[in-house]
């Protein structure tokens, strides 16, 4: 499931604009000189907004909805494949899972952040490929994938079940 909080949260990552006095100002509304001087075309991220809200929105709120919808149970998850952009978020992610009583022990986690870095939108595919190569899987095992998107506070959770050893 893909869950977005774009309708509730301010923009966190953007390009071609800036925020002035809590208003979003497009590059189209300024002169070329001002656009260049203010680096309006550079990608920007409100790190304070991100740090204060990413786990609450994309883990706690989103996963609680899915726990109710699909009757998910943490002890039925054999592996957890989270994407996070920085090691800074690992403990915060764990705390978020604990806050909603859905703790998945870290020995069940697999990520390749240390070896591959933040590979952005390709991350879950790269993680899955490495995971399938490294772990012998058994039919019926469940793999929960977590993919947040910080620009508009969206997240995707995928629950995969092993069939025929894959």
Where are these regions (language model features)?
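Claisen-condensing/thiolase-fold acyl-transfer catalytic domains that form or cleave C-C bonds
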Residues: 52-63, 67, 78-166
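Condensing-enzyme catalytic core mediating Claisen C-C bond formation in acyl metabolism
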Residues: 1-53, 159-166
């Amino acid at each position: 499931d893909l869950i977005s909080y774009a309708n509730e949260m301010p923009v966190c990552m953007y390009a071609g604009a800036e925020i002035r006095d809590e208003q979003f100002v497009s590059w189209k509304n300024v002169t070329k000189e001002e656009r260049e001087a203010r680096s309006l075309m550079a990608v920007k991220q409100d790190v304070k907004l991100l740090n204060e809200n990413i786990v609450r929105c994309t883990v706690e709120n989103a996963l609680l909805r899915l726990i109710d919808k699909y009757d998910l149970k943490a002890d039925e998850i054999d592996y957890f494949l989270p994407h996070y952009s920085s090691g800074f978020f690992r403990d915060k992610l764990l705390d978020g899972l604990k806050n909603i009583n859905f703790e998945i022990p870290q020995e069940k986690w697999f990520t390749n952040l240390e070896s591959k870095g933040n590979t952005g939108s390709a991350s879950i595919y790269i993680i899955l490929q490495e995971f399938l190569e490294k772990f012998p899987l058994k039919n019926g095992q469940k793999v929960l994938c977590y993919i947040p998107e910080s620009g508009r506070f969206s997240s995707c959770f995928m629950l995969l079940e092993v069939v025929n050893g894959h």
